[in-house]
Amino acid sequence: MAKSGLLLIHPAITTTPEEVEKAKADAVAADVKIANQFLINKVNEGSVKLQKGIYDVIYYLTPEAPDAILFPKKLIGALNEALKVGGVLYGLSDKYKIDALVNDFDIVSDSGKYHWVKKVNMAVKAEPVAVPLKKSEKSEPSKTLPSFKKAGESKLPSFKKAANKPLPTFKKKVEEAKPKVEARVHKAENDDDELEDEEDENLFDASRSKYFDEDDSESLDEDDLLNEEDAKNIGGITMITCGKSKTKKKKACKDCSCGIKEEEEAEIDNIRSQQDTVVKFTEDELTEIDFTIDGKKVGGCGSCSLGDAFRCTGCPYLGLPAFKPGEPINLDSITDDL
């Protein structure tokens, strides 16, 4: 007897009807009769409903590659219900392997064509079976339970009440009064503190006096501490030896009052005046280097009026602002530097 089959078609496969005919021919060769043929989108929308447990084989025909198949996962459970126990589903790949296991499919890929098989143990539900209980052939005589006699009521022991005797009385021991001990406090007077301070000062003075002997026999004369060279310079004048001429020269003390300090200041002023006369320029000499006056000598660059960026390293106008050609420039401010 031929198996009942279902053919589900992808909408894109309708453009190649030869693929559909080939799939039907393969089914007939496998002894499968295609009972129904539906578009997968119709089943997904619910316009076509599959009956439960009537198909032995379901074929899904799609032009997609096995790794790129797009199949609605909710239909995997519906296809499982449409198959009979042990039914086979062709056309899906390992991309939906987890969904197949969840919906009670076994995956077969070892031999032949890859397919899914509906599990038998999950589809068939075990029905409850009644098991009769057999009685034992030899009926054992019923055993009577042991009987227990109620213990006789025994009389409780009786106790005689003791005679009422008065309790012994105890007198509180009288505590002997302890003699009060007054704390002896020695009150120090202020006079004692003053006496102690005076005694400490006397001891301190006595300890210091041993380092200061007032004997006149050990006093030194201050003149005995000076040597001959110190005696010569006792006048307060310091002699300085010149590094070139090797001659000694007097130098005034810090608080000189003998007139040597004034002589040194006059000598310094004389040297300064001689230096000023050596490097001082006359007005004509200053005019010769004035580049702004026509007919006078000019610098090699001729750009002194443009500013420091255009002046030579030895230009006398360095540091001055830029000026117009022909504008008189006063160089008195730099005479001290020349």
From Swiss-Prot:
Main location: cytoplasm
Keyword line: 2Fe-2S, 4Fe-4S, Cytoplasm, Iron, Iron-sulfur, Metal-binding, Mitochondrion
GO annotation, biological process: cellular response to oxidative stress; iron-sulfur cluster assembly; negative regulation of hydrogen peroxide-mediated programmed cell death; negative regulation of nitric oxide biosynthetic process
Region (Fe-S binding site B) residue spans: 301-315
Region (Disordered): 181-223
Gene that this polypeptide is encoded by: DRE2
Lineage: Eukaryota, Fungi, Dikarya, Ascomycota, Saccharomycotina
Family: Belongs to the anamorsin family.
Protein name, per record: Fe-S cluster assembly protein DRE2
Binding sites annotated in the UniProt record for [4Fe-4S] cluster: C301, C304, C312, C315
GO CC terms of this entry: cytosolic [4Fe-4S] assembly targeting complex; mitochondrial intermembrane space
Linker: annotated span: 166-232
Subunit annotation: Monomer. Interacts with TAH18. Interacts with MIA40.
Tree of life domain: Eukaryota
Origin species: Candida glabrata (strain ATCC 2001 / BCRC 20586 / JCM 3761 / NBRC 0622 / NRRL Y-65 / CBS 138) (Yeast)
Pfam families xrefs: CIAPIN1, DRE2_N
Localization of this protein: Cytoplasm; Mitochondrion intermembrane space
UniProt-annotated stretches for the region N-terminal SAM-like domain: 1-165
Gene3D superfamilies associated with the record: Fe-S cluster assembly protein Dre2, N-terminal domain (3.40.50.11000)
Chain spans, region Fe-S binding site A: 242-258
Residue span of motif Cx2C motif 2: 312-315
Cofactor(s) needed for function: [2Fe-2S] cluster; [4Fe-4S] cluster
Residue ranges of the motif Cx2C motif 1: 301-304
GO molecular function: 2 iron, 2 sulfur cluster binding; 4 iron, 4 sulfur cluster binding; electron transfer activity; metal ion binding
